[in-house]
């Protein structure tokens, strides 16, 4: 916990500094509160991190650069930084004693959870390894040829890579938990000082027991949830009289969400609506909007082309115009992203092709205990929220949020209908009901009760084998005494690794029998041998070095002759 606390302090100073840099870089006078200033710093750092990753990894050179920029901004904005910190301290001192105690409890619970071991399959499949590749090489040419999931390299992983401090002996994985703590601090302070329909974020502490399960690993889903909460907060607060500065901030946040994960596409409903409402849009306004869009789209396409060879990954649109050696072969791309494989998490390809729509719907609904809870919640909210809006909040802004929700569900239905890609809407609608229908004293009691649930899950972690349908399960993350000082490892896989040669590629593979897609935490390049031999046997492809003697030159998929396959 102590080591994590030190990393949190550095993250705070960096985001604070880059918030000022973001205002300067995007040339806008954002009227933002203390929390959104730090979120602006986060997306500014993510933007700069993407630019850096085109040329190098987040190694010692980057951290010298980051330290230099931090020192420079701290000198230039030293007065503003001092005022910022004083304002935060004054706000904390001003709140009531019971709120201070609650805030202190939340602080230690989030810190303890952050120092614990994370146990998620996606973390073992590609989160850990994606961050390691970013640390070592930045955006790596043809990385998707080694593991199809690496094509998803997220902006959230870029950020976590920056703060993983790979040159140390510790396993840092704490950005998500730190951002959750910031949101909680804002919520508790605002809970007493301001109370209005636009301040939905004050209800956030009641969701800590769920949100912490997203932050214990570097899940891009938490990045989407965080940005979504901020965007809806700004949208409701400024809907009646939007200005170009607020619109531009919401637009930046929406673009940033797309760099994190394409499931953030539903966010674009909000800037589109505000764009229509803003009057007197100047030529300068349109040029700024267009140039910002081109920069972000260019970064997104460039990253995709380097890693997978598909400009609009996870779509294969226009990929035929890019005849590049390191492009993931179409057969492997289709294996991972064709419709029956996108539904594989709840049905086999045969079931997708043979079952009726109702039978598929039922399998999706009842896939597991946790899926059943969230899937039923999504369906209920589709039916209940319109009635709630009509009865209590019959205003256009709330209907637009619901429209975004329906659009997101339609998008997921034709791509990958997993509840976690729409869970942000469950959170925001739950917060609306919580804020508008629960009394202030009852709110505080629920805040406190929610932290008891967090404490219980720290001491007795969720056993996902009891609520999940996945055939492979990891040991639950348990807080240990040594975690008071040192953070737990990033990986739950306790396996030795052996070196295997396949053609000109030398790779590490776990000796222990692990999940088909999982790699764990080991030296690069790392690949589950079962996975390699599966694609070799069924598709006649193996990953190979572009340059026989230099891994840094990239990877491609080599087509084998059937007679050479053993």
Model-found features: residue ranges?
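Membrane-lumen/periplasm interface segments of specific transmembrane helices
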Residues: 115-118, 287-364
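Intrinsically disordered, polar/acidic, low-complexity terminal segments
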Residues: 321-348, 450-566
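Signature aromatic-anchored transmembrane alpha helix within multi-pass, membrane-resident enzymes
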Residues: 245-253, 289-294, 440-473
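Hydrophobic alpha-helical membrane-interfacial segments at the cytosolic entry of transmembrane helices
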Residues: 96-109, 278-305, 449-455
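Hydrophobic, aromatic-rich transmembrane alpha-helices
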Residues: 17-24, 177-193, 353-395
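Membrane-interface alpha helices of multi-pass inner-membrane proteins
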Residues: 48-53, 212-213, 246-273, 292-295, ...
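Membrane-embedded, hydrophobic transmembrane alpha-helices
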Residues: 1-89
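Active-site lumenal/periplasmic loops and adjacent helix-entry segments of GT-C-fold
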Residues: 110-196, 215-217
